[in-house]
């Protein structure tokens, strides 16, 4: 458990230091993928084709670490979000999101959505139904940290509908 906390704190510290890059003067809405990736601290990876069925819009997946603790850079185009989903575990498990660039959203089932900005960290316990993704007018990148556990699995659920997403301010 101490290793997980240490890794999470190290990732947050590194991300905060690296994300202090200047913003695009044109505004993020007009920013291209190439422009956005120049200001992100992590390589966005490749199109997230393996999980495309669970996303509205284009996302990209870049592995940062696949040993000990899985850490992946997930990059979302403006308006892109994943479906509602749950990270199940018999013991431990869950997910940690560390926001690195752009603006995004996180929402737990039955609660108000929370705006995400670089340096923000979200701890998601196992068993919590939630979604996350980019703001409508901004590219967004976060690190997804897979919290180790026993009997872990993901359950992908219904999409976040356009009418629900459009109400976010």
Where are these regions (language model features)?
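Conserved hydrophobic/aromatic beta-strand scaffold that supports enzyme active sites
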Residues: 61-63, 71-75, 96, 113, ...
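Short, charged/polar surface micro-motifs in flexible loops or helix N-caps
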Residues: 69, 77-80, 103, 150
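Ligand-binding loop in jelly-roll beta-barrel domains
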Residues: 105, 117, 126-154
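A short, N-terminal "cap"/entry segment at the start of jelly-roll beta-barrel domains
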Residues: 21-72, 83, 153-169
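Bacterial Sec-dependent N-terminal signal peptides
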Residues: 1-27, 31
